[in-house]
UniProtKB/Swiss-Prot annotation:
Protein species of origin: Lactococcus lactis subsp. lactis (strain IL1403) (Streptococcus lactis)
InterPro entries assigned: ATP_synth_B-like_membr_sf, ATP_synth_b/b'su_bac/chlpt, ATP_synth_F0_bsu_bac, ATP_synthase_B_chain
GO molecular function terms listed in the Swiss-Prot or TrEMBL record: proton-transporting ATP synthase activity, rotational mechanism; proton-transporting ATPase activity, rotational mechanism
Protein name in UniProt: ATP synthase subunit b
Pfam families associated with the record: ATP-synt_B
Membrane topology field: Single-pass membrane protein
Location relative to the cell: Cell membrane
Statement: the UniProt record of this protein carries the keyword Cell membrane: yes
């Protein structure tokens, strides 16, 4: 009996291989008929999604690079604009400084001129006052020396001649 089992065993293994192979082929045919399109469509959709994601990432990278270039250009423009604003402010400050200095110089010149005019006026008034005082003193001295009073015209002639002598 045991020999019979041993002799039948090689046939069973061969039979098993044939049955399993047949089942596998049937399974492949069934998979091909019912599931192959679904499986390949899943793989195709996954491949398409990955491809779209890669394209989107590349587009985003390009957009980011463009945005960086734009921001750098704007920054350069802002720096240039700031430099222009500073230059304009410096120019305006220089012009204002020049105007203030010119105004101050004009005011100083005007004040100096007015002061000189005031000094000249005061000098003239002082001379007139001194002339009047000298005339009064001269008349008093002349009255005492002559012993008589002088009339207004004689007094004026005496003053003028005295002042003329002082002026020489």
């Amino acid at each position: 009996m045991s020999t019979l089992l041993l002799e039948a065993a090689p046939n069973t293994v061969l039979g098993n291989i044939i049955v399993v192979s047949g089942a596998f082929i049937i399974l492949l045919v069934l998979l091909r008929l019912f599931a192959w399109n679904a499986i390949t469509s899943v793989f195709a959709s996954r491949a398409k999604k990955i491809s779209d994601d890669i394209d989107a990432a590349e587009a985003n990278n390009k957009q980011a690079a463009d945005l960086v270039k734009q921001r750098q250009a704007e920054l350069a423009g802002s720096k240039e604009e700031a430099a222009n604003i500073i230059q304009v402010a410096n120019d305006t400050a220089s012009q204002n400084r020049a105007k203030v200095l010119a105004t101050a110089n004009e005011e100083a010149t005007s004040l100096k001129k007015r002061a000189q005019e005031d000094i000249e006026q005061e000098r003239k008034e002082a001379l007139n006052t001194v002339k009047g005082d000298v005339a009064d003193i001269s008349v008093q001295i002349a009255e005492k020396l002559i012993g008589q009073s002088l009339d207004a015209s004689a007094q004026q002639e005496l003053i003028d001649s005295y002042l003329a002598k002082l002026g020489e």
